[in-house]
């Protein structure tokens, strides 16, 4: 399971001209599901995302996690993160989870984060989305479990 996280000062997702998810300070999470992923991996990754210290403390050092920084999550499904780009000029998605598996783990990720008290906004699974953000830093990390 893959989470490409970006520290943002704001981010939003638009589908069919309507904003469906929007946050101020927090993390934009692009979430990719691979074939071997399961609930245990999802919980481990969600915990890592929420606990990862990417926000600056009073000394300017990246030392605060999402909760300590008072941030929110915007979680967007992103199956292309599971692409194999090692050969040729066209990505292969054979390692990506099935749509059913991906939807289940995406929704479970969101529910898990919400259950921990994190303000969690979302995109729309399998939709054509317009994602906009202001990357704060820029700070971007690729987390995998």
Swiss-Prot record:
Motif (Gly-cisPro motif, important for rejection of L-amino acids): 137-138
Subcellular location: Cytoplasm
Disulfide bonding pattern of the chain: none
GO cellular component, one term: cytoplasm
EC identifiers of the protein: 3.1.1.96
GO BP: D-amino acid catabolic process
Reaction(s) the record says it catalyses: glycyl-tRNA(Ala) + H2O = tRNA(Ala) + glycine + H(+); a D-aminoacyl-tRNA + H2O = a tRNA + a D-alpha-amino acid + H(+)
Keywords in alphabetical order: Cytoplasm, Hydrolase, RNA-binding, tRNA-binding
Organism superkingdom: Bacteria
Chain ranges passing through the membrane: none
Main location class: cytoplasm
Any one GO molecular function term: Gly-tRNA(Ala) deacylase activity
Enzyme kind, highest EC tier: hydrolase
CDD domains in the record: Dtyr_deacylase
Function per UniProt: An aminoacyl-tRNA editing enzyme that deacylates mischarged D-aminoacyl-tRNAs. Also deacylates mischarged glycyl-tRNA(Ala), protecting cells against glycine mischarging by AlaRS. Acts via tRNA-based rather than protein-based catalysis; rejects L-amino acids rather than detecting D-amino acids in the active site. By recycling D-aminoacyl-tRNA to D-amino acids and free tRNA molecules, this enzyme counteracts the toxicity associated with the formation of D-aminoacyl-tRNA entities in vivo and helps enforce protein L-homochirality.
Quaternary context: Homodimer.
Family: Belongs to the DTD family.
PANTHER family in UniProt: D-AMINOACYL-TRNA DEACYLASE 1, D-TYROSYL-TRNA TYR DEACYLASE
Record-linked NCBIfam families: D-aminoacyl-tRNA deacylase
Entry's free-text remark on domains: A Gly-cisPro motif from one monomer fits into the active site of the other monomer to allow specific chiral rejection of L-amino acids.
Name this polypeptide is given: D-aminoacyl-tRNA deacylase
Organism: Shewanella halifaxensis (strain HAW-EB4)
Lineage: Bacteria, Pseudomonadati, Pseudomonadota, Gammaproteobacteria, Alteromonadales
Gene name of the encoded protein: dtd
């Amino acid at each position: 399971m893959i989470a490409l996280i970006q520290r943002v000062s704001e981010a939003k997702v638009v589908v069919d001209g309507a904003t469906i998810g929007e946050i101020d300070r927090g993390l934009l999470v692009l979430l990719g599901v691979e074939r071997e992923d399961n609930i245990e991996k999802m919980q481990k990754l969600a915990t890592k995302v929420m606990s990862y210290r990417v926000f600056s403390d009073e000394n300017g050092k990246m030392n605060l996690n999402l909760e300590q920084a008072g941030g929110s999550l915007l979680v967007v499904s992103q199956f292309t993160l599971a692409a194999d780009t090692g050969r040729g000029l066209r990505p292969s998605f054979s390692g990506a989870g099935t749509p059913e598996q991906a939807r289940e783990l995406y929704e479970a990720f969101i529910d898990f984060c919400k259950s921990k008290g994190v303000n969690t906004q979302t995109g729309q699974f399998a939709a054509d989305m317009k994602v906009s953000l202001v990357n704060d830093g820029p700070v971007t990390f690729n987390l995998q479990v």
